[in-house]
Amino acid sequence: MRLLPEWFLLLFGPWLLRKAVSAQIPESGRPQYLGLRPAAAGAGAPGQQLPEPRSSDGLGVGRAWSWAWPTNHTGALARAGAAGALPAQRTKRKPSIKAARAKKIFGWGDFYFRVHTLKFSLLVTGKIVDHVNGTFSVYFRHNSSSLGNLSVSIVPPSKRVEFGGVWLPGPVPHPLQSTLALEGVLPGLGPPLGMAAAAAGPGLGGSLGGALAGPLGGALGVPGAKESRAFNCHVEYEKTNRARKHRPCLYDPSQVCFTEHTQSQAAWLCAKPFKVICIFVSFLSFDYKLVQKVCPDYNFQSEHPYFG
């Protein structure tokens, strides 16, 4: 019976110790902080509870971990705003709202034609952009390797495709606002392909270029009085680049000939008087002439343009 107290302490000692500790630390839903340093003069006994730490924002009591963001700071923000110490907040970016959007009806290549022969090559491409506000823009570029005259005009759908009047000489009329013709873009460039550069006279290119530009500009480049009242256009951009390339002559490979390469770009802004607007393209050189009318359909958006 002497060993009874020892067995009693071994069996019930841990249970009694837990009871004693729980009596000193009251239960609470929040974690408690115990002082681990010696108590100072006038301070409480060791084991006294310390106040919970404040958050770095001054918005209330911090949570169990320093990186835990408080769930609701409405009351604290209201109090801070009343005191004049409202913390800075991030401004939210608003999505950009486009006031107006240009409606692109056709892509690059709405009207085009390509001619490639043994003596020269010609490429004309363009596009039409409808701005929805009653105006449209015509963008045009061409690349040629032969002396000649090129004309691009805006015409109504009733314009006939014919060669009549192209070769008749006559004075060049005064250009109108509605004229979209590159008159005189290719005058005086030099002899055609196949003629030796040494044999070219100084007046050959100039006289021929003027003779070609006059009749063609009058017949195809400038619309009539009725069309000039209907169309209202002005040039926004115009640029022309010329380059001369040498190559062996076709009739005599021992001689050196040259070809004229011309690249031009232009853009016009016009009013839209008709539902369908056609582009009239004409090209006239020494041994080749071409006229073509392209009428894109504004009601049907297609990748392939309509050639009239």
Curated annotation (Swiss-Prot):
Residues 40-51 have a biased composition (Low complexity). Glycans are attached at residues 72, 133, 143, 149. Its main location: secreted. Expressed in brain, spleen, and testis. One of its GO terms (molecular function) is signaling receptor binding. It is found in: Secreted. Residues 40-59 are annotated as: Disordered. Pfam families: Neurexophilin (PF06312). Residues 85-163 are annotated as: III. Coiled coil: none annotated. The keyword Membrane does not apply. May be proteolytically processed at the boundary between the N-terminal non-conserved and the central conserved domain in neuron-like cells. Keywords: Glycoprotein, Repeat, Secreted, Signal. Residues 164-224 are annotated as: IV (linker domain). Belongs to the neurexophilin family. PANTHER family: NEUREXOPHILIN (PTHR17103), NEUREXOPHILIN-4 (PTHR17103:SF10). May be signaling molecules that resemble neuropeptides and that act by binding to alpha-neurexins and possibly other receptors. This is Neurexophilin-4. It comes from Homo sapiens (Human).
